[in-house]
Amino acid sequence: MITAETRIVALLGHPVSHSLSPRMQNAAFAARGLDWAYAAFDVEPDGFVAAVHGLAASRFAGANVTTPHKLAAAELADTDEPSVNTLVFADVGIRGYSTDAAILATLDQPSSPVILGDGGTAMAFKQALPEARVFARRGDWPPDVAGADLVVNATSERAEVLAGLGAGQTLIDLP
């Protein structure tokens, strides 16, 4: 049961009805015995700033941010990140973090990475991999991933990307 003491975390995106995050996060909160709740909110781009300020004023703990709001979240938050997927509401303002590229810490340093996409997630990987070749669906498509040892797919395209992969290439395929 949600009470006045319950800490609430939001997922902000457009669309978000398909997201499994609320089910996963609420199960994790329950397993840890936390009085926390997680809910998804479908927020259109023109309402994003108002939604974030409303959540902060309502004493939400924070929010996860997904498509198409990661760049706007970075502009609102106290951060140097170009793209933000996590907002923490604090007494002194809104702190922003990006966890998108954290998976890179588990891999060997790539020598020839390729990033597919030009949104917030792709920007987070571009900051972590400044030497990467970048392909966006608006221009350089289909992508040339030949010679890449790491392919980061930050698009909704799957079949074309998978068809272009060869032996020895690592794929990070993001939803």
Predicted regions, residues:
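Glycine-rich beta-alpha junction loops
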Residues: 14-16, 67-69, 120, 156, ...
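Glycine-rich adenosine-cofactor-binding loop
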Residues: 13, 96-129, 136
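Glycine/Thr-rich phosphate-binding loops of Rossmann-like dinucleotide-binding domains
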Residues: 73, 124-125, 160-162
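Short, well-ordered alpha-helix to beta-strand connector turns
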Residues: 84, 110, 129, 148-149, ...
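Conserved beta-strand segments of alpha/beta enzyme cores
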Residues: 35-39, 133, 170
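Rossmann-like adenosine-cofactor binding region
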Residues: 140-175
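Phosphate/diphosphate ligand-binding glycine-rich loop within oxidoreductases
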Residues: 2-106
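Short, conserved beta-strand edge motifs with alternating hydrophobic and charged residues
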Residues: 66, 115-116, 135-136, 152-155
